[in-house]
Each structure stands twice: as structure tokens, then as C-alpha cells.
Amino acid sequence: KYMIMIICSLFVGTIAMQHLAESGIIITDQMPFGWDNPLFGKELGLNWDTILPEATKKLESDGYKLFSAIVSMMFFSGVLKSLAGPAPNYDCQKILSTKSPEEASKMSGFISIILLPIRYFMVMGLCVLGILFFKDLALSHHADGINFESIMPAVINKYLPTGLVGLVLAGFLGAFMSNFSGTLNAGQAYIVNDIYLKYFNPNAERKQIINMGYLSGIVMVILGIGLGLLIKDVNMIFNIITAGLYGGFVCANVLKWYWWRFNANGYFYGMLFGIIASAIPPALSVTGITNYFDGTRMLYFFPIFIVIQLIACILGSYAAPATNKETLIKFYKDVRPWGFWKPIHDEIALTEPTIEKNKNFKTNMLNVFLGITGQILLTLLPMYLILSKWTSLGIVLALFFVIVLIMRKTWWKRLTDY
């Protein structure tokens, strides 16, 4: 599947570069000033009024005008999600399938290196083709004007060779099915193992377990299809996932690493109240009760979801006894987390005076900063390549090479450290 996507991406990007070269058009002259600049100010700063007024309306209706606030919220949520570690879905399954923590770190790092350039080579290729031939595309319209989400299928249908169209669609379907099946399988496992077997039927027979797996899968698929029919556009999906779903569980998954007093009771109530709070805005939006949360406004409520979940986590944790000391001591000795673990560290020090705290916080934060910068550069790399902006491409490559050299010393050679 991934090889198909690589082939498709290379073909699409190459076709875009060929059309751009043959047209003789300097694409930045056709776009608002600053379009090719990855930096931005308080607002997005792209004036589409004289080029495509419908684009201005779309950006305003989707809430992307105050771009700095959106990026700040996304960065804040991204930091929390990174602190939370692998999400409790198929991401966690991938991590657990590796042989060691060192291999898990390498696998996680290589995903960005392999995935980002290939993905955005295709994305930028489709973008360039859409810009070059925008006036020739048979785009659909709705009440608010042009349906911009019809640009990509129109470009694929009209400007890619027939055989390549089939390959691209096969790649898209393959990517969808792998993501869908991975998420579905993880959901079924949680429902069957953590709910059905633990609380309802601990002595269930094999056939009962299989049937419950089938039933839970069918219910999730039906709910997913129903939600899909209510979704208005891609922007709504983005906001539901970023602000809603992640906002519902991120705080509980952060605390489990950094606070010794956190327990299963706190995790349960944190997840419960977090998901309920974060599900209300999407539910009101998709059901048409109100359009207040349309656009990116839902993203601004992310801190509120975090506060609600944090309070629920703390109260829930103190409402039940702490996790037994043997488990906490074993976890601390194996993982050596930084954070609020002083009582556990002091207790271990009574019998093991040589035990040291994790002193790699500053190095870890440096690696996080370098990693984020490196991922941004990997995203820019194929974009500048397709646009034939060789100076910008050279700067990106040079910066990425410097980051690789630094992280080779601060990350790669220290993967076995705590």
C-alpha cells in the first residue's frame, strides 16, 4: 500500500513540475503576496480580494483569518499530545510491537522522515495543478459559492493519466482502509477486553468473546457512518479530531506519566468528563442545533476541555487510594520519568541510595524543539522542490542537515538513556 502511495506521489509531483515548467508561469505572481513564505504574523496576511474573492470569504467563514491564534492552539494541543505519549489506539499497538524502547523511538522518528516528504510531494503537486488550471476545472458550487473541496477530485480526474488515476484512487482507498481497520480493531479490543470481560462477563466463552467483538465493530461502523453523513466539510472533521477527540483524553494521558498520585479512578473520571465536555460542541454543530462552533471556533475551547478534564482527574484520583507502592516503584525504576515523583524516588532511595533522578529534561526539550523544526523542514522540502525555488530548497536542506547532526548526538546516541 505504501509503495503505491510513493509511486502516486512521485508521479503527481513530477506531472505538476512538468506543467509548471511548460507554462512558463511564475506561480507566486498568480498568488497573494507572501503565499510562499512559511512565516506569518498575527493574521494570515493573504489578500485574495483581487485574485479570488470567494477564497477570502472561505478563509473568514472557516475562521483562518486570525491564523496566529489557531497555530498557537494547535501547538499547545500538539505539545500536550506529545507529552501524553502514544495515543491509546493503533499508535500504541505499533509502539508495543517493537522489541525495545530504543526500537520504538527509532520507529517513531523514521515515520516522520519517510512519511512527510512523500505525502506533501503529492499534496503540493495537486495544489500546483489546481492553481495552474483553476479556471478550466468544472468545480461544484453550493449556497456560499465555490466548493473548494471539489478542486482535488477535479484535478485528479482531468489532469492525471487514466492509469495513474486508478493507482491514486487505489492508494487513497488503501490508506483509508488501513487507518480505518487499525482504529476499528483497537476500539473493538478496548470494548471487549476492558469493558465486557472486566465488568460484565469475566468468564465468557471464546464464542461469546468473538460475537461481542463482531457486535462492537458493527455498532462502531454504524455510528461512524452516521457521523460521516452529518459532517459538513473537511474543516469540521479537522476541528472535531483536533479539539474534540484529542481534547477529551489528552490530559489524563499526560498525568499518567508525570504524577505519582494519579490512578485508574482519576483516569476514568478524567476521560469521562473530558470526552463529555469535548463532545458537546461537535454534537451541537453536526446536528444543526447551532452553527456557533463552525469553522475553527471549536479549537479555541480546547483549553476549557483541558481544565475540565484536569479537575476531574485530580478529584477522581484523590477519591480513591493511591496505586500500590510496589507497582509505582517498579514503574519508576523501569521508566525513570521526570515530573512529580519525589515521594516514590525518596522511598526507593531508602534501600537503593545510588538511584538517580532523570536529569535529561533539558536535553529532551531541546530534542522536542529540534524535532518539531525538522518536521516543518521535511514538509517544506517537497513544496520548494515542486515550485523550483532552489535557494529556499537549499536553505531548508542545510538547516535539516544541521538538525540531523545535532540530534545524532543529543537523541540517536542516547536512546538507551532514561
Regions found by a protein language model. Name each.
Residues 1-418:
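Membrane-embedded helix-loop-helix hairpins and adjacent transmembrane boundary segments
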